[in-house]
């Protein structure tokens, strides 16, 4: 594959996530009915984001915790020139201590444990077991896109980085699927088919399979993304991303359909956005969305630095 194509998709992955996250904030936590009420003509631009108590905490065009935490991982890869699990955990904790805006409850509970930075995976396991092994939130899959941009050991690294906060096998499987999809797109110009994704899912948890099934054969609406009780479930987010991967005809079409579905829209659009960015390349992300990001130039510098590791 041409280096230019790899670079296009590499940049597309990170910008695709950040744009999806920033645009998804517009409908985060809304029901489909509320989305239709606040955005009767859809949404085309960050300037249209309604300013209620939740959304006004961010400036328009800013991304949220999803991309903040993904950048903690990226910064660690660049600083250490390798995967250093404890360094990533330290950066997560530092981000949390410096405000950590938008942090999920589960992630906060794990990182609030006293010895988190010295044994993060143990902390994640403790909190998971305390919750009777029921919690499978989307706080790890939301940041895993960058792991797919590593040259090798993608599955193993996705597992280990996921377990820094989320120990449940549904979370781990979600991260491995997303990272593997991105890696195959960027470095091999290859789309994983239904059987391959099912094969990865079955290695981690059988409960992933019905969600893969659903989005492969049905539309996005079958996921009920705005379901109040389960909108933060890792398998709903994975499902939305897989729907975009297999069915969306462009970055813009896929992202807008997910954003206008409401629910945990910033996370759903962040993960789907990373995959669509990897599939179509940065040039196919609308220019006004890329340039409209509050920290577009900072993001560009960070990605260039990470990409330079491969030269």
What is each residue range found by the language model?
Residues 1-311:
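Structured, active/binding-site neighborhoods that engage oxygen-rich ligands
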